[in-house]
Amino acid sequence: NEESDLIADKFTNYNKLIRPAKH
């Protein structure tokens, strides 16, 4: 649903912020 999709998007952005060099 929309809510879990929004959470997943924020979580993805969070992972990008904490591990930018890993990707």
From Swiss-Prot:
- Catalytic function, reaction form: K(+)(in) = K(+)(out); Na(+)(in) = Na(+)(out)
Q: Does the keyword Endoplasmic reticulum apply?
A: no
- What membrane topology is given? Multi-pass membrane protein
Give Gene Ontology CC terms: postsynaptic membrane
Q: What is its main location?
A: membrane
* Location(s), subcellular: Postsynaptic cell membrane; Cell membrane
Can you name one GO molecular function term for this protein? transmitter-gated monoatomic ion channel activity involved in regulation of postsynaptic membrane potential
Keyword entries, A-Z: Cell membrane, Ion channel, Ion transport, Ligand-gated ion channel, Membrane, Postsynaptic cell membrane, Receptor, Synapse, Transmembrane, Transport
Q: Which family does it belong to?
A: Belongs to the ligand-gated ion channel (TC 1.A.9) family. Acetylcholine receptor (TC 1.A.9.1) subfamily. Gamma/CHRNG sub-subfamily.
Q: How does it assemble?
A: Pentamer of two alpha chains, and one each of the beta, delta, and gamma chains.
Q: Please explain the role this protein plays, according to its UniProt record.
A: After binding acetylcholine, the AChR responds by an extensive change in conformation that affects all subunits and leads to opening of an ion-conducting channel across the plasma membrane.
Query: What protein name is recorded for this chain?
Result: Acetylcholine receptor subunit gamma
